[in-house]
Amino acid sequence: MNWEMVIGLEVHIQLSTKSKLFSTSATKYGQHQNTQAAFLDLGLPGTLPIVNKEAIRKAVIFGLAVDAKISKDSFFARKNYFYPDLSKGYQISQSTNPIVQEGRLEIETSKGLKTIRIERAHLEEDAGKSVHGYIAGETGLDYNRAGTPLLEIVTYPDFRSAEEVVAYLKKLHQLVKHLGICDGNMQEGSFRCDVNLSIRPQGQAKFGTRAELKNINSFRFIDKAIEYEYARQVSVLESGGEVVQETRLYDADANETRSMRAKEDAFDYRYFPDPDLLPLVITDEYIESIKKQMPLKSEEREAVYREHLAEQEVEFLLSNLEIADYYDKVAVVIGYKPAYNWITVDLISTLNRAEKEFSSDVVPAEILLEIIANVQKDIISQANAKKVIAEYIDAPSAIEAIIEKLGLKQVSDEGMIRELVQGIIAANPQQAADFKAGKTKLMSFFVGQAMKASKGKANPKQVNQIVQEELNK
């Protein structure tokens, strides 16, 4: 019998906010245990939640980016279950009428384009974390993560292969980073995926019994987990057994899924409206104000890049979204191709020599544009621009002061340059004669000698012009 795989996804993205969804605690990753947990995060009596406005804004940004409906009135609800890392005994989430509904994301697969329907995206708070082995033989609880704002993005069961799932997740991962709503760090848990997988005979409309796969933190492991679980369910059904509804844990070392617990349905959580939180009202004016601040959609950005850049250059920018954002700021001022060359040839190569990773904070776009302006005004040469960049990386200060400190101002005095060139021609009579005899490539020799004699300070445009004039006398 031929079996068809049916998959729906639940992706939890941690929103990039400085504070938590309902408390003022910080959300920095990697801090000492329980140093970023307010009384509310610990579930202490008498504490009340206050909604983080920035989390709402980021949820709306996502909804607009996937062409979804933004709910004008949505509600927070209590999702009731017991787990040690859930201090309150419930999680504040959204059940009916979530903030984002009915979106879509188009993916590219080996069979062509496919549209994946997004059923909903709702806000909820993250749970704490169980820490095993910190104290020998015991489990500790770290509530630093408790209350961190999550956006849970739920698809319809539209996937029919692991390839489609990975394509969607990569596209979604790229999108949320591009929008600036999530850093996408899978190792730190900022982008987590649960896979709901079932199988059915090919051509059958009715869905099979699904298993939920958890603990998958890389695209490669997601592919492996899906293929393993598909084979497991086929084996169970073909041997006369029944697939049970359960949550299964993926073990990357053993490349297998293991039963974790029975999978709950929505009614098991006994959702009810949170009495401490008013309905969330979003106006048309608020939505319009966010639309005006939205970056280009990734498809629109890609189309613009392809119009002006080579394929390899486009792929480089699309796979490095922080660099792409930086590039956009520079390109709008000096043009697409010059901006790419300045960033890759001058800036990134200088960063590499300094053994530093690219970050828009190291040399802000405004600083690079100021350096470029000095080159365009013939104040410094293109070659010396790298020295200015390197000095700024090492000790940030005013660009004008760096140019003065390094003595990089170009010499544009025509009389001085002409005298320099005449001296070089006089010192190299054989090369001058060869040039006049037709060996025009020697032009670069004289230009190089002039630039060397001026210690790189002579204006190269003037040097070229004057060398040509003097040799052709």
UniProtKB/Swiss-Prot annotation:
<comment type="similarity">
    <text>Belongs to the GatB/GatE family. GatB subfamily.</text>
</comment>
<keyword id="KW-0436">Ligase</keyword>
<dbReference type="InterPro" id="IPR023168">
    <property type="entry name" value="GatB_Yqey_C_2"/>
</dbReference>
<dbReference type="GO" id="GO:0050567">
    <property type="term" value="F:glutaminyl-tRNA synthase (glutamine-hydrolyzing) activity"/>
</dbReference>
<protein>
    <recommendedName>
        <fullName>Aspartyl/glutamyl-tRNA(Asn/Gln) amidotransferase subunit B</fullName>
        <ecNumber>6.3.5.-</ecNumber>
    </recommendedName>
</protein>
<dbReference type="InterPro" id="IPR006075">
    <property type="entry name" value="Asn/Gln-tRNA_Trfase_suB/E_cat"/>
</dbReference>
<dbReference type="InterPro" id="IPR004413">
    <property type="entry name" value="GatB"/>
</dbReference>
<dbReference type="InterPro" id="IPR018027">
    <property type="entry name" value="Asn/Gln_amidotransferase"/>
</dbReference>
<dbReference type="Pfam" id="PF02637">
    <property type="entry name" value="GatB_Yqey"/>
</dbReference>
<dbReference type="GO" id="GO:0005524">
    <property type="term" value="F:ATP binding"/>
</dbReference>
<keyword id="KW-0067">ATP-binding</keyword>
<dbReference type="InterPro" id="IPR017958">
    <property type="entry name" value="Gln-tRNA_amidoTrfase_suB_CS"/>
</dbReference>
<dbReference type="GO" id="GO:0070681">
    <property type="term" value="P:glutaminyl-tRNAGln biosynthesis via transamidation"/>
</dbReference>
<comment type="subunit">
    <text>Heterotrimer of A, B and C subunits.</text>
</comment>
<dbReference type="GO" id="GO:0050566">
    <property type="term" value="F:asparaginyl-tRNA synthase (glutamine-hydrolyzing) activity"/>
</dbReference>
<keyword id="KW-0547">Nucleotide-binding</keyword>
<dbReference type="InterPro" id="IPR014746">
    <property type="entry name" value="Gln_synth/guanido_kin_cat_dom"/>
</dbReference>
<dbReference type="Pfam" id="PF02934">
    <property type="entry name" value="GatB_N"/>
</dbReference>
<dbReference type="InterPro" id="IPR017959">
    <property type="entry name" value="Asn/Gln-tRNA_amidoTrfase_suB/E"/>
</dbReference>
<keyword id="KW-0648">Protein biosynthesis</keyword>
<dbReference type="InterPro" id="IPR003789">
    <property type="entry name" value="Asn/Gln_tRNA_amidoTrase-B-like"/>
</dbReference>
<dbReference type="GO" id="GO:0006412">
    <property type="term" value="P:translation"/>
</dbReference>
<comment type="function">
    <text>Allows the formation of correctly charged Asn-tRNA(Asn) or Gln-tRNA(Gln) through the transamidation of misacylated Asp-tRNA(Asn) or Glu-tRNA(Gln) in organisms which lack either or both of asparaginyl-tRNA or glutaminyl-tRNA synthetases. The reaction takes place in the presence of glutamine and ATP through an activated phospho-Asp-tRNA(Asn) or phospho-Glu-tRNA(Gln).</text>
</comment>
